[in-house]
Amino acid sequence: MVCSKGICGMADGSSIEWTDATWNPITGCTKITAGCDNCYAARFAERFRGVAGHPFEQGFDLTLRPARISQPLAWRRPRMIFVNSMSDLFHKEVPRPFINRVFDTMEAADWHIFQVLTKRSPLMRAYLKYRYADRTPPAHLWLGVSVEDCSSKIRIEHLRRSPAAVRFLSVEPIIGPVGPINLGGIHWVIAGGESGPGARPMHIDWARDIRNQCAERGVPFFFKQWGGIRPKSGGRDLDGREWNELPTTMGVHAA
């Protein structure tokens, strides 16, 4: 079952500007940083807590969805697929055998590009070092971490030391200045403001600083949104243009 443009399960098409589709073999999560305070996924899921038969009858409680594991194999046209837009694959309560099954599917469906994003960077790094200890990470698996301000930059270092063909940062929601970023071994940076009720404003200089660092290092930069209660109304221009750059470097391993 899918709902709201596939936010519950898998959807061919996404309102997220930097992907083509979403796939949620896991739903639900727990808040661990200030960047989670106004989580869109939790807000959506909790609306349906207690609604019998709804995919989010249990609200945003962590839930494994084994019936969805093979979904990407049925899509023959290549897509960029955001993995677990409604959860975190590396949540501490997700069993390693289940993570193995998700990776097995991603590796088998090598005509797609899979975008895996986490805030739990130590667990991601440990898993990737285990899985790719004696082989090259597939080029179609992109691994990323979320960063919201300068206090969360340790995740970038964990990512840089993880075996992956493409490593990316999602600096969203930007809730404070990030400061200098070590972009060695990073192939893509997404940035954007917070959206929805209670959204914290993003200062333009925070976004400019990230963009300028990317330009200096030749790292593709994607500006997703200004944010706010109605994020689409603010447009996506930063200094007079949209920034829609995508990764061009693949096959590069731990920095």
Where on the chain are the PLM-derived regions?
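Auxiliary Fe-S-binding modules of radical SAM enzymes
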Residues: 1-31, 48-51, 161-164, 175, ...
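Short, surface-exposed, charged/polar-biased interaction segments
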Residues: 50, 57-60, 104, 127, ...
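Non-transmembrane, interaction-prone segments in cytosolic or luminal domains
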Residues: 55-63, 96-98, 237-238, 243-244, ...
